[in-house]
From Swiss-Prot:
<keyword id="KW-0274">FAD</keyword>
<dbReference type="InterPro" id="IPR036188">
    <property type="entry name" value="FAD/NAD-bd_sf"/>
</dbReference>
<feature type="binding site">
    <location>
        <position position="126"/>
    </location>
    <ligand>
        <name>FAD</name>
    </ligand>
</feature>
<protein>
    <recommendedName>
        <fullName>Ferredoxin--NADP reductase</fullName>
        <ecNumber>1.18.1.2</ecNumber>
    </recommendedName>
</protein>
<dbReference type="GO" id="GO:0050660">
    <property type="term" value="F:flavin adenine dinucleotide binding"/>
</dbReference>
<dbReference type="GO" id="GO:0004324">
    <property type="term" value="F:ferredoxin-NADP+ reductase activity"/>
</dbReference>
<feature type="binding site">
    <location>
        <position position="46"/>
    </location>
    <ligand>
        <name>FAD</name>
    </ligand>
</feature>
<dbReference type="InterPro" id="IPR050097">
    <property type="entry name" value="Ferredoxin-NADP_redctase_2"/>
</dbReference>
<keyword id="KW-0560">Oxidoreductase</keyword>
<feature type="binding site">
    <location>
        <position position="90"/>
    </location>
    <ligand>
        <name>FAD</name>
    </ligand>
</feature>
<dbReference type="GO" id="GO:0050661">
    <property type="term" value="F:NADP binding"/>
</dbReference>
<comment type="similarity">
    <text>Belongs to the ferredoxin--NADP reductase type 2 family.</text>
</comment>
<keyword id="KW-0285">Flavoprotein</keyword>
<dbReference type="Pfam" id="PF07992">
    <property type="entry name" value="Pyr_redox_2"/>
</dbReference>
<dbReference type="InterPro" id="IPR023753">
    <property type="entry name" value="FAD/NAD-binding_dom"/>
</dbReference>
<keyword id="KW-0521">NADP</keyword>
<comment type="subunit">
    <text>Homodimer.</text>
</comment>
Amino acid sequence: MNIYDLIVLGAGTSGIYCASYGAMKGLSSLVIEMTDRIGGQPAHVYPFKKIYDFPTANGILAKDFVDQLYQQQKPYITQGLITYLHNTTIQEQNYLDDQQLFELKLSDNQHVKAKKIILATGNGGFEPIKLKDELIQDQNLDCIHYKINDLTQYQNKDLCFLGGGDSAVELINQLADLKIAKSLSIIHRNHKYRAAQALVDLINKKPINQYLDQTIELIKDNKISFKDNQSGESTQLNFDYLIVQYGLKPLKSLECFDHLEQDLNNNFVINHHHQTSDPNIYAIGLASNFSKRPNLILSGMYEATVAIKHINDTINPYLRATDYLLKE
């Protein structure tokens, strides 16, 4: 049975860097990810969204940012300090007092052991909120996209976005800037967008057909019919691709950690070391969301360093490692 210093649950940006920083300290990590790829929401939901609020990331695409995080840790993967398991969840966890180790049963029936566990699961697993089945009739579902993986497929196509949050508005702005689509339209159920005002200001300056305060009636044969909530007037648009950005809904995947103390929002309660009510289990990122916490990629990475430093000091109490560069 494999024994690791750390089990990192969740391979979003916080979890990826958590494993990297642990490897810098010589700690071995098994990173368990319930989906088929790493990166969390930046990879799964908005890979073509640009990141500005991270040091040195001056408009880097989210997918490229995730790739850079992975490239940083590739030497540690080669050394065997970082291992990934995809499409995997933890089914059972028990703490063996005599060995001071966790024993975990995974969804593939594999058993592993670890000294510490770090929960980096964000809001838990998630999946896109999809269109209601009754709205879709005689429609090729391949033309309905809930995430964007390849922009080239939209070359000279009629695109229609559904949604009015940051993801929908920012993505359609980017496509307008790239000038690859034949036409761009956006349909939103409310009378105003739920996106940042700076993004809304941009969309109003671009050749984008906007339909606000609308109710979707039918999607059939690459046509979408919708009704104005004020006038009752119906409209029909042709599309090549329908891009749905209604947000995400959580998937419950942490049942075996329900014994840990949680707040009213189901976030794990932590101390200043990011330990949960079980001192051998840590939580970082949105899994430990607390009042006034900045919802930034940078925040999760800082929290990873706090947790890793405490774990390393606990596992290797006589190893006096520095967390800064010494001047020569």
